From Swiss-Prot:
Its EC number is 3.2.2.-. Coiled coil: none annotated. GO terms for molecular function: hydrolase activity. Transmembrane segments: none annotated. Activated upon phage infection. The lineage of its organism: Bacteria, Bacillati, Bacillota, Bacilli, Bacillales. This is Putative cyclic ADP-D-ribose synthase ThsB1. It comes from Bacillus cereus (strain MSX-D12). Disulfide bonds: none annotated.
């Protein structure tokens, strides 16, 4: 069954057409359902919008989605709003995956080396009572509390074994390579 997927990406990768390869791979299949995806992402370039308006735009884009797919290019890890989309997806309870997209040619025929994994730069920690989740980001050579989304109460108290421990998102969420892992044929299984 097809999932409503929110794609998170750096806008430069749209300009280079790498994002479009993944988001539009369904057009050569029978339909979006056969590809396993209904795209619920934001196409707008909202660079001139306030922080509050951008958060509202992202939050609205995440509504009615069950999966967040982070398309990893060269600078994705460093983008403030990609980080927000990931952290908000955790709060929402979406399944989260990453996909490296630098292994196929851009519109100029160039291939790039893999970009840094954004999940290496984000993390979380359950409170000692297991009732709250605190979010962190790697910045300035150290882990700091994430400022764009406050700690929040979790729906279900965390098991004692998870309380008070820090987890990098890369230890929790899977990352694939669109080319090496055959994303064209396997994407629907990744999001299910």
């Amino acid at each position: 069954m097809a999932k409503r997927v929110f794609f998170s990406f750096h806008y430069q990768d749209v300009i280079d057409f790498r994002v479009n390869v993944v988001r539009n791979h369904w057009v050569t299949k029978l339909n979006q359902s056969a590809a396993g995806v209904f795209d619920a992402s934001l196409w707008e370039d909202a660079k001139k919008t306030s922080d509050i308006a951008l958060k509202r735009l992202i939050n609205g884009g995440l509504n009615n989605t069950s999966v967040t797919c982070v398309l990893i290019g060269s600078q994705t890890f460093n983008r403030r709003w990609v980080r927000y989309e990931i952290m908000k997806s955790i709060e929402k309870g979406n399944k989260i995956i990453g996909i490296h997209i630098n292994a196929f040619k851009d519109k100029y025929g160039n291939i790039k080396s893999k970009g840094p994994n954004p999940f290496d730069y984000l993390g979380y920690q359950y409170s000692s009572d297991g009732k709250q989740l605190h979010l962190y980001e790697w910045t300035g050579g150290k882990w700091e509390e994430y400022k764009d989304l406050a700690p929040y109460r979790v729906n279900q108290i965390a098991p004692e074994s998870l309380r008070g421990k820090f987890y990098s998102l890369s230890s929790v969420y899977r990352v694939y390579d669109w080319v090496a892992d055959d994303g064209y044929n396997k994407f629907s299984s990744w999001v299910n």
